[in-house]
């Protein structure tokens, strides 16, 4: 009896040592992982503004409010800037012509714009390829047939597609506007740029293949708006923001409707609760003891 008790005690003590060893090992691993993460965070914080790019200031965009929508006149002007300036190098592969109808242009205007381009059609009976005018269902064509042609025309640099550029960059429209208007006359002293590169403090590393493209009176707006550099940058940024979020206005409308409906249902539920429970919560129970 004594021997069996001693064996059980030894096993219990051994199990305790094993548990302590596991807990100690887990603690060591946790401390090591925390130390590595802390060291990595210090390394990330050591990145300079020149390496990461100057942080773009915040601008008061008219569509930033919870109930504000896009300035559709600005979208129309922004498309004009894209067509006359940006379309020479950048594409809008994910934007269909039909999405512009009722947003920035009329149905007839968009049809006319689409018909200015030719798209591949089904081959004829002899198997020869054919071309056809663009339709509303087509997507905005790019300036180059493939990536190799784009790089060859831009000294090896690949101009990014602008369909989702606002959502794909930290800072969104603020970054795009700051980049377009942030080219200085000369790079700062001590900055050495590769051949063919341009200096822009908002671009990571400061060296960018794209030079300044917006200058005062570069385009002539249809509505007579003065085409200053900042105005063109604002308009094309608004247009690109719409390209990234074409559902922006509709989403806010649905959100407002949902808030109204949910608020009404909440107030109705409060009234029903008070109506149903008022008599129950305010009732009094009187106990009359029997007379002897």
Swiss-Prot record:
Mitochondrial intermembrane topological intervals: 47-253
Classification via Pfam families: Cytochrom_C1
Residues that bind heme c: 86, 89-90, 210
Key words, A-Z: Electron transport, Heme, Iron, Membrane, Metal-binding, Mitochondrion, Mitochondrion inner membrane, Respiratory chain, Transit peptide, Translocase, Transmembrane, Transmembrane helix, Transport
Segments passing through the bilayer: 254-272
GO terms of biological process kind: mitochondrial electron transport, ubiquinol to cytochrome c
Top EC class of this enzyme: translocase
GO molecular function: heme binding; metal ion binding; ubiquinol-cytochrome-c reductase activity
Catalyzed reactions per annotation: a quinol + 2 Fe(III)-[cytochrome c](out) = a quinone + 2 Fe(II)-[cytochrome c](out) + 2 H(+)(out)
Residue stretch of the organelle transit peptide: 1-46
Membrane topology: Single-pass membrane protein
SUPFAM superfamilies registered for this protein in UniProt: Cytochrome c, Cytochrome c1 subunit of cytochrome bc1 complex (Ubiquinol-cytochrome c reductase), transmembrane anchor
Region entry Disordered, spans: 117-137
Cofactor note: Binds 1 heme c group covalently per subunit.
The protein's Enzyme Commission number: 7.1.1.8
Residue intervals of the Cytochrome c domain: 73-226
GO terms under cellular component: mitochondrial inner membrane
Essential cofactor(s): heme c
Principal cellular location given in the protein's record: mitochondrion
Residues on Mitochondrial matrix side: 273-292
Localization per Swiss-Prot or TrEMBL: Mitochondrion inner membrane
Function: Component of the ubiquinol-cytochrome c oxidoreductase, a multisubunit transmembrane complex that is part of the mitochondrial electron transport chain which drives oxidative phosphorylation.
The protein's assembly and partners: Component of the ubiquinol-cytochrome c oxidoreductase (cytochrome b-c1 complex, complex III, CIII), a multisubunit enzyme composed of 3 respiratory subunits cytochrome b, cytochrome c1 and Rieske protein, 2 core protein subunits, and additional low-molecular weight protein subunits. The complex exists as an obligatory dimer and forms supercomplexes (SCs) in the inner mitochondrial membrane with cytochrome c oxidase (complex IV, CIV).
Protein family according to the UniProt entry: Belongs to the cytochrome c family.
Name the record gives this protein: Cytochrome c1, heme protein, mitochondrial
Source species of the chain: Kluyveromyces lactis (strain ATCC 8585 / CBS 2359 / DSM 70799 / NBRC 1267 / NRRL Y-1140 / WM37) (Yeast)
Lineage start: Eukaryota, Fungi, Dikarya, Ascomycota, Saccharomycotina
Name of the gene this protein is made from: CYT1
